[in-house]
Amino acid sequence: MQTPKLIRPTLLSMAILSSMAWATGASAALVPPKGYDAPIEKIKTGDHSFSCEAIPKPYTDKLVFRSKYEGSDKARATLNAVSEEAFRDATKDITTLERGVSKVVMQYMRDGRPEQLDCALNMMTTWAKADALESREFNHTGKSMRKWALGSMSSAYLRLKFSESHPLANRQQDAKIIEAWFSKLADQVVSDWSNLPLDKINNHSYWAAWSVMATAVATNRQDLFDWAVKEYKVAANQVDKDGFLPNEMKRRQRALSYHNYALPPLAMIASFAQANGVDLRPENNGALKRLGDRVLAGVKDPSIFAEHNGEKQDMTDLKKDPKFAWLEPYCSLYTCSPDVLEEKHEKQPFKTFRLGGDLTKVYDPSHEKGDKGDNDGS
């Protein structure tokens, strides 16, 4: 049957409008959640005690490190003190850089001193120019360090790139060098963590996806954004109907800790996706909410996890407030209950270098408490 002539222009118009809308959507620049546009708090010009610490030596060697769980069985739940010390020693320069960038960016966003901006950018450009962390020789612990470092730096850098104070306006050459380096590292992280069998996909993959999401926005790369979203969906579909992650339940006495550790990258990815018009909350029937609720219930009553895997839970890590930094993006995605909000406010501010610094300043600035908090995150 022929389409009536009167309808043809309408269909054509719809097609044109549809293609225009698609083109507009495809070209829209990626952005972080709203709080990342915050200006410098108060520009200070008087005497100060700030001094830029020595930049750690760029790590250009192969990324092969001992695991802190060396000698443990498949559960990877028993720490080896000797190998942990060796790991900390071998990766010291990397973690010093991560912590340093995060700390100095926070200081700059508070005080606005040019010396602070110089310090943060010099740390990153020094490592970028040395092609640090790019080695193709790595083991599992090594590729883990690469994605952690990338996530730490790129998420701190977002505070500079998107601030309405425009601190990078006159530092475009530095920005170009840093973003090109982040981009290369992200490509390698994608390669490192792609196509793993489902039984090998756990919190490490989620943290890799977070580092790629932060870099996607820092470098405006849609392909990286799409990969992070894809990995999030894999993670969400690992959450069972009761809110447990089977691969993290294998961690025996540390199962609850690792469920909690899985939440920061997933909540951040969902928050960043939402800022760019992608709502990941419905994935696998609200998997992120289910996981968050299960962890919060487990923290109140660890026997929930003990009954599920037969192991009394080690609560050591869960006594550290920064371990709950995921509550900031989580409570921006969902309406948290009054008791959860009360707990969140008691623990604030949440400063964790692996998520780029002070998340309370980004997500809940009215509850910021100045210098409280230690920027934990390991």
From Swiss-Prot:
It catalyses: Eliminative cleavage of alginate to give oligosaccharides with 4-deoxy-alpha-L-erythro-hex-4-enuronosyl groups at their non-reducing ends and beta-D-mannuronate at their reducing end. GO terms for biological process: alginic acid catabolic process. Substrate binds at residues 67-68, 140-141, 258. Its EC number is 4.2.2.3. Residues 359-378 are annotated as: Disordered. It is found in: Periplasm. Residues 1-28 form the signal peptide. GO terms for molecular function: poly(beta-D-mannuronate) lyase activity. Residues 364-378 have a biased composition (Basic and acidic residues). It comes from the Bacteria. NCBIfam families: PRK00325.1-2, PRK00325.1-3. Catalyzes the depolymerization of alginate by cleaving the beta-1,4 glycosidic bond between two adjacent sugar residues via a beta-elimination mechanism. May serve to degrade mislocalized alginate that is trapped in the periplasmic space. Belongs to the polysaccharide lyase 5 family. This is Alginate lyase. It comes from Pseudomonas syringae pv. syringae (strain B728a). The gene is algL.
